[in-house]
C-alpha cells in the first residue's frame, strides 16, 4: 500500500492536459486536471496520440518521467496500468476465474467513474441526464462477492462514483449478476441479455427504462475506453 500522486500529462493546443491518480494507503481516486500538489511521479507524453498509443499497447515508446521522488513507483505503476488497459480493451472473457474477477472489478470501477467523469467534462447527454435527476443511486453487483460492486450517485447535476456496495439505502436501480460469466457476457456484449434474464443470471432491480438509460451511458464509456 502506497501514498502518493501519479500524474499523466501531454501538451495540447498550447495548454497542459493532465489527469492524476491519488494513492492513499490502498485507496485510489482519479482526478481530472493537473495535481495541485507536486506529483510523486509524472509521466509526460509528447502529445495525445503518444498518450493513447501507449495505453492502447500499440506503441512502447516511453514517456518522460518527471518529479520521480521514488523510483520504486515507476515500474509497478506503468505495468499495472498496461495490464488494466489490456483487460479493459479485451473483446472476449479470460479463461481463468481470477482474471475474470479482476476484469469484472475493473469494469465495475470504470463504468460508474467514466459516467461521472463525462458529466464533469461536459458531455451534453450525460450533463442533461444528471441535471434532471433527483437523488438516485445506480449499482452494479455480483451476488456473493462484496469486492465486485460499484455505483454512481446522481443528484441535481452532480455525480459521484464509488467502489463497493451502496449500503445507506436501497439503490434506485441495480444490475445484479449471479456469476462472473453472466457479468462479462453483458459487459463485453457477447451474451444475450434476454436469455440471461430468463435464466435469472441477470436481475434488474428497479425501473427498466432507467436501467436502459444508464446502460447506454455505460456503453458510451466502454467505447471511449477501447478507442
Model-derived features with residue positions:
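Feature captures hydrophobic
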Residues: 1-227
